[in-house]
Amino acid sequence: NLFREDDGDYSIYATGHGDLPEALRESGLLRRFLADRGGGYVWMTNLDNLGATVDPAMLGWMAENEAPLMVEVVDKVGTDRGGVPVRWNDKRIIAEEFRLPLSLDANAIRVFNTNTFLCDAARLENLIFDFTFVEVEKQVQGRKAVQFERLLGEITVGIEPVFMRVPREGVASRFLPVKDNDELARRRPEIEAIARAR
């Protein structure tokens, strides 16, 4: 059954960020970006990461080295969880911790994916890859709901990445996730300092 809100309407939720490559392709935006605007790179990040911006030095490095995909990673702090860089079938990929073998201690991997990607637009346009749907349990209006999401880190299976370790502290921070208004208010001085430094 589809989940319904208390008022009987179907519950609407944001899709997983893994829908973005297909949406850019299927909408024609990516094709027009390449053909009509001469676009070369697509920058993708989570909306809640207020530290992420397009960095000209990173973009220049990508162009000079003809790297198809750059994934930003940061040092883990506390209970950080998320996709981690690993080798799988002799390829570098981002693997979500729940997909790692039980014998592998995810805490031994000291960095994780910030969900900030810089990708060669032509490679993204030509990517033929079916992202996996992941079952995610959530609480909605006090009731258990299951939603299906696709995760952008899986793009690394289809496009070979380079991993860029970026700072998460101080005015150079590129990872500043803010999940709600209370956290936004609490971290406002830090956000303002980062914005002024850029």
Language model regions located:
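Conserved N-terminal catalytic core of the sugar/cofactor nucleotidyltransferase
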Residues: N1-G39
